[in-house]
Curated annotation (Swiss-Prot):
It holds the Pfam family NifU_N. Gene3D superfamilies: 3.90.1010.10. This is Uncharacterized protein MG337 homolog. One of its GO terms (biological process) is iron-sulfur cluster assembly. GO terms for molecular function: iron ion binding; iron-sulfur cluster binding. It comes from the Bacteria. InterPro entries: NIF_FeS_clus_asmbl_NifU_N.
Amino acid sequence: MDRKIREQIIAIYSNLQHKQDLTQFAHCLTTKADDNCEDFFNLGLQFQNNQLTALGFNGEGCIISTIASELTLSALEGKTIKEAIVLLEQFMEAVQTGSLSTPLPQALQLLWDFQIDQKRLNCLLLTPQNLLQWLKDFSH
């Protein structure tokens, strides 16, 4: 991993802006991992006029899944539900194909730059994958 990226990750992990108590959030979901992973996060979402106005998380996970939660929520704050779905789909497609076809917001770009090996991919995708599915279900 590039030294600059490592320094950014450490700085973000040392000052998680979205890790908080979730009692004030109207909508909450819990991420689900596979049987080989004990990481879990509760995600809190606030909407106003179809826009994500506040996001938060709490729970336990490795540094990769924690940073992925923080950066995913950072990238989606202020977006409409439709915009959030499109961004998450673009990110998931890039990770699955190994190719970035469209520019990503800075926070998701940093996740892309992680260069995670296959063994840790579940950690990276825990929050983006679960949040994408929840937003799709919520919007229908």
